[in-house]
Structure formats: structure tokens, C-alpha cells
């Protein structure tokens, strides 16, 4: 997606016949004026927002202010590859691709089926989020993505010593990780939310590791036990009676002992805990929408303190 303030979207939303009219995902309303299907935003509510100037809805899998680009449009796909090459020419080492499986949607705009209550689980969203009540067959993780990843890899391979790392949240994230990294012609590596669960369980950790090795034997994994979307692991996996510092050392040792690469979220190596913030202090629209079951991401996005005993965390400004 882009911002709704981006010049591409500002042009696209003006009419149905401008040069960028098809650069975003636009759809006519249902006969009764409601959105074209039942797709939901992860951040709450419909994934469709009405635009009166076009008399159509636009798709936003995340915030209303983040309209989805239309990767089915060859001009959009080509432009995004050019954006990547722009930065590669400037010497970047590669790209971490956030929510990479959300680029493509079902062009027929079919509604997602319902998910049985016993199968609803949160991976990057809370279980009371209506998003958990659907099987996300049509709004993300579409087969067209594989071809685009191969085109992206062809661009990346022209620049030695660069790499791509994908973040994936899908119905079967381990399977998607395997598909998106298969054959040394798509992503170099990827990670999913399977170890970003709320509660620590030895059985779950073992199941995730063994499942990934069994189902994707040639895959070079990337592991993460924390990131900017979930509560800090020192708090999330806290153990009564075990000092935070000791547990943090154990968790870091565990992470670094796994086969593959690792992502360490800033402060994680120090055992930084979640900041407890009241509702009135939240800035994250995701947390405001789903308080108190999900308190948002502000608590894990605090700066890493230089000196926690000093004013302003030890920083001068």
C-alpha cells in the first residue's frame, strides 16, 4: 500500500479515467450500496472505504489511510520493481518485506468463508478481532505472488551480496514460507508469527521447529521471537520466580542456537520489558480499536534506554 496522501492515490481517487485510475484496488458497490464483499481490515471494520468522487470503494487491508496498490496492473508491478532497483543502485544491502503476502488479491473479489470458532487464533491479531473469524483465501496469499517474487529476485540477483527477507502472516504460514523461498528463485529467507505467540510453550516451540524442518527441508530459516507488532518477549514469556535478566539471556541463547538467521528486535538483547500504557496514552489506532484484549503496539515501540535510571532514558533530547 501507499499513504492516502501519496500523489498516486490522490490522482487515482479523482476519477475512473485518469492515468492512475487502475493503480489501486477499486470496486463498485453491491446493489444495496454496501462493500463488494466481506473482506475485513486487520485493524477493524471493513477492508473497503467509500470514495464519492469515483462512486467506488477502495481496498485497504490495514488502515483506511493505507490504500492497497493493484499489483494485477502490470504498470504497478513494474513501478514497484523500479522502486526496489532505485535503492539497490544506491547501495542498500537488501529489503525486509513487510506483510509480503498481501500484495495480490482475488480479481473476482470473492468473499472469504467463515472459520469455525475452534480454529480461530491470533497471529499478529487478537482472537476477539473479527478478522480471526474468516478463512483468508481471497484477500491475501494469492498464487500470482509467486511470479512477482521471481521477478523481484531477478532484479536483486543483479546486485551481489544483497538479500530479501519476507514477513509472512497467512492461514498456513509455514507452508507459505516454504513456497515463497522455494528453489533459490524467490525470497532468500522469510519468517512468520509462529514464535510470536502470547504464551511460552515448549511443546509449541518444538512443533514449530520440527514442522518447518519437515515441510521445508531445503529452506534457510529466519527466526524471531519478538518484533514491533507484539508485546516484548521478556514480558510476553515471563516466568514467575525467574528474574527477567536471566530469562532474557536464556531466550537469546535459544534463538541464536537455531539453524538459520535471526531477527533481534531492539532492546530484546537487554531484556527490555513491555511499557504499560493506559488507554488515554495510546497512539496506535490498532490498540485503541481493540482495547483492552489487545493493547496495541505502543508498549513495544518505546525507545531502547541508554540508561534507565537517568532522565529521558539517558538521552540528552
Region locations from a protein language model:
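Receiver (REC) domain switch/active-site residues of two-component response regulators
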Residues: 93
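Reverse-transcriptase-like RNA-dependent polymerase core
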Residues: 311-317
Amino acid at each position: 500500500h501507499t499513504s492516502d496522501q501519496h500523489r498516486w492515490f490522490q490522482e487515482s481517487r479523482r476519477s475512473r479515467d485518469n492515468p492512475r485510475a487502475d493503480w489501486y484496488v477499486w470496486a463498485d458497490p453491491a446493489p444495496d450500496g454496501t462493500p463488494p464483499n466481506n473482506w475485513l481490515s486487520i485493524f477493524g471494520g471493513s477492508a473497503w472505504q467509500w470514495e464519492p468522487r469515483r462512486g467506488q470503494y477502495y481496498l485497504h487491508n490495514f488502515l483506511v489511510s493505507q490504500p492497497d496498490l493493484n499489483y494485477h496492473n502490470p504498470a504497478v508491478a513494474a513501478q514497484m520493481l523500479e522502486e526496489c532497483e532505485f535503492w539497490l543502485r544506491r547501495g542498500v544491502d537488501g529489503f525486509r518485506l513487510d506483510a509480503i503476502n498481501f500484495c495480490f488479491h482475488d480479481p473476482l473479489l470473492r468473499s472469504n468463508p467463515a472459520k469455525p470458532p475452534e480454529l480461530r487464533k491470533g497471529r499478529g491479531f487478537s482472537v476477539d478481532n473479527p478478522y480471526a473469524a474468516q478463512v483468508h483465501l481471497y484477500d491475501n496469499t494469492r498464487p500470482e505472488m509467486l511470479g512477482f517474487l521471481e521477478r523481484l529476485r531477478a532484479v536483486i540477483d543483479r546486485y551481489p551480496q544483497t538479500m530479501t527477507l519476507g514477513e509472512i502472516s497467512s492461514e498456513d504460514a509455514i507452508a507459505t514460507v516454504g513456497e515463497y523461498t522455494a528453489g533459490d528463485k524467490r525470497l532468500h529467507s522469510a519468517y512468520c508469527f509462529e514464535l510470536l505467540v502470547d504464551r511460552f510453550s515448549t511443546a509449541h516451540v518444538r512443533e514449530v521447529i520440527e514442522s518447518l524442518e519437515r515441510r521445508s527441508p531445503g529452506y534457510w530459516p529466519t527466526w524471531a521471537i519478538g518484533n514491533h507488532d507484539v508485546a516484548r518477549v521478556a514480558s510476553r514469556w515471563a516466568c514467575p520466580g525467574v528474574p527477567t535478566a536471566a530469562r532474557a539471556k536464556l531466550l537469546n541463547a535459544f534463538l541464536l542456537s537455531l539453524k538459520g538467521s535471526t531477527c533481534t528486535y531492539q532492546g530484546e538483547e537487554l531484556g527490555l520489558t513491555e511499557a504499560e500504557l493506559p488507554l488515554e496514552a495510546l497512539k496506535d489506532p490498532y490498540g485503541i480499536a481493540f482495547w483492552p484484549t489487545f493493547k496495541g503496539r505502543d508498549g513495544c515501540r518505546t525507545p531502547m534506554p541508554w540508561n534507565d535510571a537517568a532522565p529521558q532514558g539517558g538521552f540528552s533530547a
